[in-house]
From Swiss-Prot:
GO biological process, one term: glycogen biosynthetic process
InterPro entries the record matches: A-amylase/branching_C, Branching_enzy, GlgB, GlgB_N, GlgB_N_E_set_prok, Glyco_hydro_13_cat_dom, Glyco_hydro_13_N, Glyco_hydro_b
The protein's Enzyme Commission number: 2.4.1.18
Pathway assigned in UniProt: Glycan biosynthesis; glycogen biosynthesis
Species per Swiss-Prot/TrEMBL record: Synechocystis sp. (strain ATCC 27184 / PCC 6803 / Kazusa)
SUPFAM superfamilies, per database record: (Trans)glycosidases, E set domains, Glycosyl hydrolase domain
Protein name per Swiss-Prot or TrEMBL: 1,4-alpha-glucan branching enzyme GlgB
Keywords: Carbohydrate metabolism, Glycogen biosynthesis, Glycogen metabolism, Glycosyltransferase, Transferase
Function of the protein: Catalyzes the formation of the alpha-1,6-glucosidic linkages in glycogen by scission of a 1,4-alpha-linked oligosaccharide from growing alpha-1,4-glucan chains and the subsequent attachment of the oligosaccharide to the alpha-1,6 position.
One MF term in the entry's GO annotations: cation binding
Length: 770
């Protein structure tokens, strides 16, 4: 018998050794014979007993014969090029009909795509790599593409082939990317990549560009369509595009979706497309399940809106296998976690946030990734995404791996990922986690455990260039968004534009302010007189960066206690201290972030496997604290002086910061391009002060806009009967002054009234002890 193929080629297919199975499998011309073309069709079907080719154009059936191997089939045909032919397969006495995936040779990836990706500049590579719905020659299916340049062979696994890697072997393009179109697959298909290295070892990997994954502990990717959701937030996006977020109020409620609120496991699960499957919180909390993105719309959004926050910040919602990582050990960078529902459910959640005037910020983790076998680690049998040198590629303290920022394709993966969340999910900002760990080669390393850069320094120049690139790219596509750095060192110009040498973020967490505040407020008030610099030092460097003041999740874990537990004194003083701290925070220059549970005074630390102690809201002190935060947020949003001029020296002026004996500070906040200003006076001791004089620049009646000691917040209700007139008494180098009553452990906010009608406030709202 004459064969059209040699045994060696069959051997390579049978043993998953061929880099391009299209050279062997599928339909191939054999040559012309007059007006009739001769073609050969080949197929490798490891479990087939018999195979027949079905030709739709002339309704013929041709039986295939085996060649060199009992499961390698071929047949020779004389006709015009066969298209859309099918294979009828007999196995175990059953028949099934499929389209031959090797009969579809139209690639989605162009040579230009691969070239730009190789340069690290394909900003929307997520539209090419991964799994994408396609129609080829009138047949619907899914196109798969994965970057695995050092693999010997790559196959696609799934329920559709009984997870048999011999059936859907991919072809390699330009020594970089493997691709294959599989007809008749669709949304909801579970799949993985089977990657064989040159030593013959096999790895099963989740799709790095996959849009959806199975619920942990399962790890397969799931085909998803991200283009089917109908958005309703056009007005929000247009307003964002044309505005400057740094001149707007930014008050962020940071939360972890998996521990904000749970419900009973047997409660029906609501999703965008009907009833869903419950996801148990943990083996230690078997009676509870997570709320879905869809259910959170009715629970979380009204709550945040009532409290007055402008944004929510979600601890990482990209897919991660371990709940205890809080989301910071990501395996699915392009997949919102399936714990809470589908990609469309998350789109609906963001859409509804926007329709209710709430922006959405996500925590983004480009600094490291876990070693889980199904993830990015050792992806193609080599150190592909991570540095091969553990001195540059491993965080030993965290047990994670570090991205190779100097490799174009890795950098492209991350830059495109940041863009992806803004593009496909309409998010409004990203908070980049652990920036310091990226910027320093000796981060958490002893001498001899790190490698210097090309200039002999400890700065990771590749990481710095990457951060500049990602910020430049994201801003170029989506002006008006927030890019926030959690950077805990003195690296210069973090929030400066890239064109002047900065890293390009528009905000940086002020970690120094956070540490100073918590140290100061945790000490006995009597000792605060010796530490006045703790509350004033931040203004010495405030204008070196665009700062965000954050009291985050990191401050209520690992034995640090929650905010009330940090405060000294009896219960009344603890609440008063918390109110004073947050009022000072909201009147200090800088945007604001605070973690869930602080708004009602949870006593316990945050527990990722539980939910918040909502029962505390049955008790007046916690109700009053929640009301305090609601009114503080509304004060902040309603007074341009408190937000519009945060980052210019004209926006802040000390009145007096030297009265350490009384632990009192006072200052002016001025609005941008306006004569508006507010005066803030802070008394950080339990000792009230009557007839305390404070200088002011303009005469008139100063309304007491806010008093953290008001009765409705649980305070002693000392104050100034709604406001005070100035006296022509120069004080604090100001031409006029106010004779004030300063309540204990309190902060007052005063504003010059513009007319007599504003000089009084309702009695029930006024602090009534002068």
């Amino acid at each position: 018998m004459t064969y059209t193929i040699n045994a060696d080629q069959v051997h390579q297919i049978v043993h998953n050794l061929h880099h391009d199975p299209f050279e062997v499998l599928g339909c191939h011309p054999l040559g012309d014979h007059g007006k009739v073309n001769q073609w050969v069709i080949r197929a490798y079907l490891p479990t087939a007993e018999a195979v027949t080719v079905l030709l739709p154009t002339d309704r013929r059936e041709v039986i295939m014969t085996t060649v060199h191997h009992p499961n390698f089939f071929e047949c020779v045909l004389e006709l015009e090029e066969p298209k859309n032919y099918q294979l009828r397969i007999t196995e175990n006495g059953h028949e099934r009909v499929i389209y031959d995936p090797y009969g579809f040779k139209t690639p989605k990836l162009t040579d230009f795509d691969l070239h730009v990706f190789g340069e690290g500049n394909h900003h929307r590579i997520y539209e090419k790599l991964g799994a994408h719905l396609m129609t080829v020659d009138g047949v619907k299916g899914v196109y798969f593409a994965v970057w695995a340049p050092n693999a010997r062979n790559v196959s696609i696994l799934g329920d559709f082939n009984n997870w048999d890697g011999r059936l859907h072997q991919m072809r390699k393009r330009n020594n970089m990317v493997w691709e294959l179109f599989i007809p008749e697959l669709g949304v909801g298909t579970s799949y993985k990549y089977e990657i064989k290295n040159w030593e013959g070892h096999i790895y099963e990997k989740t799709d790095p560009y996959g849009f959806y994954q199975e619920v942990r502990p399962k790890t397969a990717s799931i085909v998803a369509d991200l283009d089917g959701y109908q958005w309703h937030d056009e007005d929000w996006l247009e307003a964002r595009r044309t505005s400057d977020p740094l001149s707007k109020p930014v008050s962020v409620y940071e939360l972890h979706l998996g521990s904000w609120l749970h419900t009973a496991y047997d409660e029906p699960v609501k999703t965008l497309h009907g009833e869903g499957v419950p996801v148990e919180v943990s083996e230690w909390n078997t009676g509870a399940r997570f709320l879905t993105y869809y259910e959170l719309v009715d629970k979380l959004i009204p709550y945040v809106k009532e409290l007055g926050y402008t944004h929510i910040e979600l601890l990482p919602i990209a897919e991660h296998p371990f709940d205890g990582s809080w989301g910071y050990q990501v395996t699915g960078y392009y997949a919102p976690t399936s714990r809470f529902g589908s990609p469309e459910d998350f789109m609906y959640f963001v859409d509804q946030c926007h329709l209710n005037g709430i922006g959405v910020i996500i925590d983004w983790v480009p600094g490291h990734f876990p070693k889980d076998g199904h993830g990015l680690a050792f992806f193609d049998g080599t150190h592909l995404y991570e540095h091969g040198d553990p001195r540059k590629g491993e965080h030993k303290e965290w047990g994670t791996l570090i991205f190779n920022y100097g490799r174009n394709e890795v950098r492209n993966f991350l830059v495109a990922n940041a863009l992806f969340w803004f593009d496909k999910y309409h998010i409004d900002g990203m908070r980049v986690d652990a920036v310091a760990s990226m910027l320093y080669l000796d981060y958490c390393r002893e001498e001899g455990e790190w490698v210097a850069n090309e200039y002999g320094g400890r700065e990771n120049l590749e990481a710095a260039d990457f951060l500049r690139q990602v910020n430049s790219v994201v801003y170029s596509y989506f002006p008006g968004i927030l890019s926030i750095a959690e950077e805990s060192t003195s690296w210069p110009m973090v929030s400066w534009p890239t064109y002047v040498g900065g890293l390009g973020f528009n905000l940086k967490w002020n970690m120094g302010w956070m540490h100073d505040m918590l140290d100061y407020f945790s000490m006995d008030p009597w000792f605060r007189q010796f530490h006045q610099n703790s509350i004033t030092f931040s203004m010495w460097y405030n204008h070196s960066e665009n700062y965000m003041l954050a009291l985050s999740h990191d401050e209520v874990v690992h034995g640090k206690s929650n905010m009330l537990g940090k405060m000294p004194g009896d219960e009344w003083q603890k609440y008063a201290n918390v109110r004073a701290l947050f009022t000072y925070m909201f009147t200090h220059p800088g945007k604001k972030t605070m973690f869930m549970s602080m708004e009602f005074g949870q006593w316990s630390e945050w527990n990722v496997w539980g939910d918040l102690e909502w029962h505390l809201l049955n008790f007046p002190p916690h109700q009053q604290l929640k009301q305090f935060f609601t009114e503080l947020n509304h004060l902040y949003k309603n007074e341009p002086a408190l937000y519009s001029n945060d980052f210019d020296e004209s926006g802040f002026q000390w009145i007096d910061c030297s009265d350490n004996r009384h632990s009192v500070v006072s200052f002016i906040r001025r609005a941008k391009n306006s004569a508006e200003f507010v005066v803030t006076i802070c008394n950080f001791t339990p000792q009230p002060h009557s007839h305390y004089r404070v200088g002011v620049p303009v005469p008139g009646f100063y309304t007491e806009l806010f008093n953290s000691d008001a009765r409705q917040y649980g305070g002693s209700n000392m104050g100034n009967l709604g406001g005070k007139w100035t006296e022509e008494w120069s004080f604090h180098e100001q031409p006029y002054s106010l004779d004030l009553c300063l309540p204990p452990l309190s902060v007052l906010v005063l504003k010059l009234s513009q007319n007599a009608e504003e000089n009084t406030v309702p009695a029930e709202e006024a602090s009534n002890i002068a």
